[in-house]
């Protein structure tokens, strides 16, 4: 039986070798978003669904949502449910006078829909005046973040004549190669906003759909509305500021072995995790396992491959 067949039949819960386990999806710890700093206020809020392929060996896919806040000075694009979980956690640990603000923020988006997960780990702050992008990422099993700043990336688009209607807007097709992935997007010239999703830029209209040629990422717009929301940074989140090269190397290493130096080590001084990561075919009462950095492997599916 091929590796692909093993993964598919196991539903993603499996070990290639006895005692070596692979997580089914990243496990992000909540951030504490105390004392947020307001950078701008949105005029437009856009929500996207994202359908993600978890790895090249499996047919398993999972959904998340991305929220983009578009203001006069800044555009912020981030994983909605990862952020909301942090907001909820912050409300729980807040002082009495701060709790109502975070409770209100969490309740605004309701509960995470069934079938959706906290997969998108990035916060992309695009400064329109400085023409710079701050990339801030959560890491599996860590409360700290990593970040780097770069100029707004240059994307060289081929704009096609093909059109289609999305949410009542006539959209045009465009394609580009960017850092290891080939992207096809649909943008709406009627909404003259450069970008809107992630760090896509250089098109004369809001991104309505985007998909990678390898099928790992499919973004589809859900809603667009005129809405004021604070675009905030979170200075109390412990953050490592790195070069892009160091950022990518560290992120890859953490995803590959999330337990090593993770939250259990940081908060309990232990380099192992006790849990119930059941693999396909094991008895249901097999509920206690000890995972170490050498026996618990992660998945890595970055937006940028280069």
Which residues make up each language-model segment?
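Tryptophan-centered motif/residue detector
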Residues: 156-157, 186
